[in-house]
């Protein structure tokens, strides 16, 4: 099985507000994460990864596939209260 790689476009790093690149990588590399289809604000289709940082902070990371085993990190944000509720339900159902 091939290793999955992640890359950051420069513009995506510039758009991180209140979230460190390290926190994003924690979510992407944790064993428990919830992949879901999503859309960016401009309508771009992406894969979203819902997960927690090592400190337990719930984040959503947006990815766009660049190559078969390579993904670009194009977005990251904190979950809304409603999303946290949905994510916690998923966590309980998928222990």
Where are these predicted regions, by residue range?
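Ribonuclease/tRNase effector modules and their secretory precursors
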Residues: 1-95
């Amino acid at each position: 099985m091939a290793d999955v790689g992640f890359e950051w476009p420069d513009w995506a790093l510039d758009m991180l507000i209140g979230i460190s690149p390290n926190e994003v990588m924690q979510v992407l590399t944790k064993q428990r994460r919830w992949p879901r289809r999503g859309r960016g604000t401009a309508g771009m289709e992406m894969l979203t990864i819902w997960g927690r940082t090592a400190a337990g902070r719930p984040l959503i990371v947006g990815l766009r596939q660049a190559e078969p085993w390579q993904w670009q990190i194009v977005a990251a944000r904190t979950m809304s209260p409603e999303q946290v509720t949905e994510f916690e339900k998923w966590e309980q159902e998928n222990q």
